[in-house]
Amino acid sequence: MFARNQSGSQGGAFYLASPGWRSHISDSYFVQNRATQGSSGYSDGVIFSLLSGNTIADNVSSRNGVYTQMGESEYMVSTFVNNTFVNNRLTAKSSSLSDKTNGGSAIYFKSGSGSLNLVNNTIVGNTDSCYTTSGVPSVNFNGSAVHVISGKVRLVNNIIAGNFSSAAAAGEVYLGESASLQNSTYNLYGGADRMNITAKSTDMVCRNYDRCVQDLQKVLDSEIVDGKLSLLLSDNGGFVPTVKVKSVACGNNNLNVLSAAALRESTFYIDINDNGVYTDNLAVDGRGVTRNTTGSMIGAYEYTGESGMEPNVQQNSIRVFVSEDNLYVISDSFTVGYTIYNLSGSLQMKGEAVSGRPVDVSILPAGVYMVETNDRSGGIEFTKVLKNN
């Protein structure tokens, strides 16, 4: 957890300026951090960065980007998968701004001809505001939740809606003159007048901001306060608090529209784990819950039924654990099939284990993994495991 950190400049929770480095931040909770820019995090020059399964909530920046990614290399790639950005604020002062490049109540990206990839994120209820000393909205401001000054952008399977901006024609997505939209598929956007990109054929667009807030309140665990959406975080399984999905129906749109193909790297052509191939798929949501490949939910949270009952990520009939460099599967069945994914949903290993006998997993780096097991009875279970070395 990164909580209540402060900086008078960049990087409230962390500051990373290491050209050529690679970073992977997963299953972390960034809450109530403050900074001028990058209150939850500021990264500059990292050649590849992956954020997966994080919750970034209630952070405040006073100029640019609650999460800020900077760089100049054309090879720079920043990929966000299964993250939740809610209730963050960018509160700029009109007198301190020189142009309309400021914004990013969720993400601020400026990277020459580098790439920003957003896949299955929930970016809702964030606020960009900038007023003059007389309390009038500044005309020198286009603040949006996703604010891209330069670079190539791919938006896939996200909820980017219900974000407020004091700017007249902003709120959800803003692309500067040096930014280009490469792809937009199966996203929910808050309104055509709230972004300067054109939604594509599979995207869904709310009628207007007020209607979007009302519709989203029925979909996500939240409340409406002074006309704005305030998201409610809770323990829904996984490592960090998340926003529970109550329904798949958002106005006239159903949000559980993703087929198995829509969750494959080869379909959206984003290498979500930077292993150099496009053969993996997004098997789990931000909590580690298996996605329904016949109708998966866009955003970071997989909807599993109106009853409110969520599947337990770890069941008891098959016991799975890691000790040193070995995986152990304990079951009443003699053999059990296993598949190991990282928390981005990328397949790492697959095979058959004999109950009680070690499986060598030394090729896997330290980290948290999701293990799918299936026995002869047809039962399938999922277990999160931690590999320490």
Residue locations for each model-derived region?
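Conserved beta-strand and immediately adjacent loop positions that scaffold enzyme active sites
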Residues: 157, 186, 266-268, 280, ...
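Residue-level recognition of short loop/turn positions
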Residues: 53, 82, 120, 157, ...
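Short coil/loop residues immediately preceding or within conserved phosphate-binding loops
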Residues: 25, 38, 104, 143, ...
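Predominantly extracellular beta-rich ligand-binding scaffolds that present long acidic/polar faces
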Residues: 1-8, 14-254, 292
